Amino acid sequence: MDTIAARALTVMRACATLQEARIVLEANVMEILGIAINRYNGLTLRGVTMRPTSLAQRNEMFFMCLDMMLSAAGINVGPISPDYTQHMATIGVLATPEIPFTTEAANEIARVTGETSTWGPARQPYGFFLETEETFQPGRWFMRAAQAATAVVCGPDMIQVSLNAGARGDVQQIFQGRNDPMMIYLVWRRIENFAMAQGNSQQTQAGVTVSVGGVDMRAGRIIAWDGQAALHVRNPTQQNAMVQIQVVFYISMDKTLNQYPALTAEIFNVYSFRDHTWHGLRTAIRNRTTLPNMLPPIFPPNDRDSILTLLLLSTLADVYTVLRPEFAMHGVNPMPWPLTAAIARAAYV
């Protein structure tokens, strides 16, 4: 299936080079399009030309690219347009070994297949405590009953520890059971002035320490912590104290947008509004997948089919921009011109 996807990507990118009718095509583009169009026309009985000039010819070439995108992604889109019917035989065209594919396309498909079939340490973009159900007011003293040191979450990436005079305690428990981190990068600081429960202000005296595995760590410096070693806070002074511990970032095996080069840009290209026809087409294709149909996914996609579909659909979007096809979509009304941000915004409502 990797070679089928690589051929589809190669042919669509070759079609995206047809910026004007009399352009001098590169030799590899002529070879790719010549073989692909010949095989496609023979199996589907369409009339795609290598140099589309009229609207009908541009539509035919775009429909060929649409067929190839859907076949490579394994999508049966169904009846979406009175002007277009999906040709299931296109998979046979893409399976033809005579159609060459570029090194770039093959490498990209190999990266998608390789990265989605395994896991690796990745820097996570969200706060470590993002999914906590409660939070406490920053800089305000809080002590639980029968404790001398209390750690609480005070933000999506931060905790604070309240300590009685002369108290000490381990606070690693508040990190455990969350996000399955491989490494957490912390910075701790003294809260110079904090509010007691009665509202009066109090100062944290110098001498408060935070240690990892028994080794004192300097305040204001990034600490690499595995989440398992004892994270110990100590207040040797004769007054109450508070410290702040911030998670700068953490690494886990969860997939991110860095698993594939330019995945963020590909997602933006797919979900961008070009006109109502493209908006309806993208939505119809997305409805046959597990990805959102109108707005980008909340969390990074982590399976091969989703990322491959995004890559193929982003390339189809480029072809749509170049060929400027015009065809009807079921349930889609023509858009007013000129295109404005307000018109584009309204399409997502």
UniProtKB/Swiss-Prot annotation:
A GO CC annotation given for this chain: viral envelope
Residues carrying a glycan: N287
Signal sequence segment: none
Organism domain of life: Viruses
One of the protein's GO biological processes: fusion of virus membrane with host plasma membrane
Gene3D superfamilies with a match to the protein in the record: 2.60.120.170, Bluetongue Virus 10, subunit 1, domain 1, Bluetongue Virus 10, subunit 1, domain 3
InterPro entries linked: Capsid_hemagglutn (IPR008980), Orbi_VP7_capsid (IPR001803), Orbi_VP7_capsid_C (IPR023178), Orbi_VP7_capsid_N (IPR023176), Virus_capsid_a-hlx_vir (IPR008935)
Alphabetical keyword list: Capsid protein, Glycoprotein, Outer capsid protein, Virion
GO molecular function: host cell surface receptor binding; structural molecule activity
Presence of keyword Glycoprotein: yes
Intracellular or extracellular location(s): Virion
Location, primary (coarse class): virion
Family: Belongs to the orbivirus VP7 family.
Assembly behavior: Homotrimer that assemble in a complex of 260 capsomers on an inner scaffold composed of VP3.
Primary role: The VP7 protein is one of the five proteins (with VP1, VP3, VP4, and VP6) which form the inner capsid of the virus.
Designated name of the protein: Core protein VP7
Lineage, opening ranks: Viruses, Riboviria, Orthornavirae, Duplornaviricota, Resentoviricetes
Gene from which this protein is expressed: Segment-7
